[in-house]
């Protein structure tokens, strides 16, 4: 009896000791594990989640929402689902579902809704290309008997749909702001003479290119407004394509009425041009300090991509704070390693410029012939 109790006690002590040793061993292994890998950046996780959610959402394969989440009361437009099976939807579209659903909520094979402002809101938020495909674009009820034969002729107001704009005529636009580019009498003399050291008249630019034995045939005007730069260059047998956004006024339609080519694309989009085919890229007022620095860097290097060797980059009245030009934008521009043909900086003397210490920069830079 005493022997049996002693044996049981010994077994109990051995079992407890074994468990203690096992716990110690496990805890030491946990502590000796290698350090965890660095976390994935939040912005990258967000982009990956956005892309995954877009694919799942548009193909009805998304996992069930957690119990605490409220179910969406907005149904997905059927044409959006159809498009998603054929082409990828830009991931930024998912970040603006209300705008996207409003834009895609139309009746196929009928007239497109009058919602150009919704389309531009999506484009400016990175939702591009837009997915709407199967409706008929609207046209004016009364068509003008003739269209302008020269890019500086009077523009026929009946050739446009004005319902999306506050102003309902070109005269209204010209009176509200003569510098918007809708007064052809004013535009006819633009880019032709000096008003300050920041200006580079087109005749002088053509002479500069001839003296350096450069040929200018094809160009892109980024943020070109109503296309006046393209119109003036057309008189020198240079083909210029103008990128523009409407933003409350019929810029794209006006470019087309003048017999020129408008591209309705935002600044953040990759330029829809093949590599190394352009002789000139001009950046107008739309390219300025309000563009995020990273986007500006992408834009400059995309311009380098489409320019041929020996082609020109023309920054026309780029404005920023003087300190930012010295510390941020000038070093950014010099990354291209282009030859400096013109570099002029002057104070921006309007109220905003004086208040913020802003300056204008006009630069003409030439891409190296080879690299």
Which functions belong to the PLM regions below?
Residues 2-208, 362-364, 369-371:
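N-terminal accessory regions of S-adenosyl-L-methionine
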Residues 213-225, 314-337:
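Conserved class I S-adenosyl-L-methionine
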Residues 226-238:
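Conserved SAM-binding loop of SAM-dependent methyltransferases across substrates and taxa
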Residues 252-270, 274-275:
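S-adenosyl-L-methionine
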Residues 268, 278-294, 319:
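A short SAM/SAH-binding and catalytic strip from SAM-dependent methyltransferases
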Residues 293-310, 330:
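A short glycine-rich, Lys/Arg-flanked "PGG" loop and its adjoining helix->strand segment in the class I
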Residues 334-371:
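Core SAM-dependent methyltransferase catalytic element
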